[in-house]
Amino acid sequence: MAEVVTGRFAPSPTGALHAGSMVAALASWLDVRAQGGVWLVRMEDVDTPRCVPGAAEQILSQLAACGLNSDRPPMWQSSRGAAYGAALAQLVEAGLAYPCACTRKQIEQDALAAGHLHLRQAERVYPGTCRPERGGLAGRAARAWRLHTARAGGSAAVSWSDRRLGRRSQGVEAAVGDFVLRRADGLWAYQLAVVVDDAAQGITDVVRGEDLADNTARQILLQRALGLPMPRYLHTPLVLAADGQKLSKQNGAVPVAMDDPAGVLRAAAAVLGLTLDAGRPVGETLAQAVALWRAGWLAR
């Protein structure tokens, strides 16, 4: 059976879509449409405390105004706990996941004591304090669950080819450490959820912003550990704020107004290097964008 190209747009409903998230939405849609595939929307609402009531509905309304409609009903991560639990159980049974009792303060102390001075996003890389071979919980109560990156193959470099960024590689154990699969507050971690959901939805092509490229090695490691297929990856250019950082809700990004959806599409396409004609309705604007994507991005 021939492969059905399947892509997805997976926003977190912490607010309405801004200019940066519109670029990611359009890119993932164009990539699928240019290949005659299936485009899906997934609401990554696994971090429920951060979700804003009504944001998911607002996001779906913005997408619909721009002609970007999911080919199936959206998936909601908040309803997927059983699937994530099954994946964690599989990892535990294989000896690839373990419970962790460490607080952030203890991680900081243990990392410094072990000479691990490397900071990752202002936090210490987890030094493996609760690994089973180091004594495990040692009588303490479990707080979280972590992937044993060494046993999962993360000591060696995890390599992949990005359709835009080229050959990429990361030694997950050294760069990230044993990352969290289930958090101390009981919520499922993003890395596990996205890997399980990509496989469940048959995602063949992950198209997302370049800021998420750093997650790829961890996700590939989990895919291998769970025996799941690895999709192709394409990380797109970012929209930058005035301070040169990625545009986000944290640095002043405002919701995209939908009084001119075709104009919103043209602006997003421009970030992707696509120049679209002004004055066309949404349907014609999207058709032109698909043709340009097929001639440009797919031809790479």
Curated annotation (Swiss-Prot):
Gene3D superfamilies: HUPs
Database matches in InterPro entries: Glu-Q_tRNA(Asp)_Synthase (IPR022380), Glu/Gln-tRNA-synth (IPR000924), Glu/Gln-tRNA-synth_Ib_cat-dom (IPR020058), GluQ/Sye (IPR049940), Rossmann-like_a/b/a_fold (IPR014729)
Listed EC numbers: 6.1.1.-
Matching SUPFAM superfamilies: Nucleotidylyl transferase (SSF52374)
Keywords: Aminoacyl-tRNA synthetase, ATP-binding, Ligase, Metal-binding, Nucleotide-binding, Zinc
Co-factor(s): Zn(2+)
Coiled-coil zones: none
Ranges spanned by the short sequence motif 'KMSKS' region, renumbered to the chain: 246-250
Keyword Ligase: yes
Protein name: Glutamyl-Q tRNA(Asp) synthetase
Species of origin: Leptothrix cholodnii (strain ATCC 51168 / LMG 8142 / SP-6)
Record-stated family: Belongs to the class-I aminoacyl-tRNA synthetase family. GluQ subfamily.
Domain of life: Bacteria
Residues that bind ATP: K249
Cofactor note text: Binds 1 zinc ion per subunit.
Taxon lineage: Bacteria, Pseudomonadati, Pseudomonadota, Betaproteobacteria, Burkholderiales
Positions contributing to Zn(2+) binding: C100, C102, Y126, C130
Pfam short name (any one): tRNA-synt_1c
Sequence motif: 'HIGH' region, positions: 11-21
GO annotation, cellular component aspect: cytosol
An annotated GO BP: glutamyl-tRNA aminoacylation
PANTHER family attached to this UniProt entry: GLUTAMATE--TRNA LIGASE (PTHR43311), GLUTAMYL-Q TRNA(ASP) SYNTHETASE (PTHR43311:SF1)
Residues at which L-glutamate binds: R8, F9, A10, P11, S12, E44, Y190, R208
GO molecular function: ATP binding; glutamate-tRNA ligase activity; zinc ion binding
Transmembrane annotation, as ranges: none
